[in-house]
Amino acid sequence: MYKGGRLTICDRLTQIKESIYYIQQWSKEINCADDFLASMDKVMVFNACVMRLQVIGEQVGKLLFLQPSPLSEYKEIPWLAIYDMRNLISHEYSNVDEQIVFTTIKNDLIELDKVITCLLYTSDAADDK
């Protein structure tokens, strides 16, 4: 958890990794987008997952605009789309589409987690120049 002060690159990457873990744990029983609306408990899962997607997007945005960006090496990840999703969640929450959230969780987070893990183990991220 954030305890104040300036976040380092590693702090931001760790927040992304933690968020991916939480989302994957919370959404284990979600098998389709409609499951998010099946009960109040599932709506809470949806809201929690979306909040963590927002955290991921916020941290990606902070890392994306660093010069040089530690993310620039991994062009296979749609970094700007991740940041754009954060903006949608933050500014147009009622327009968040359950299907897009479901697809993101089930199809995209695994690859993102692999890249974030690689970034955490690179000396550039660890050095935090």
Identify what each model region corresponds to.
Residues 121-129:
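Conserved small/polar residues in nucleotide/adenosyl-binding loops
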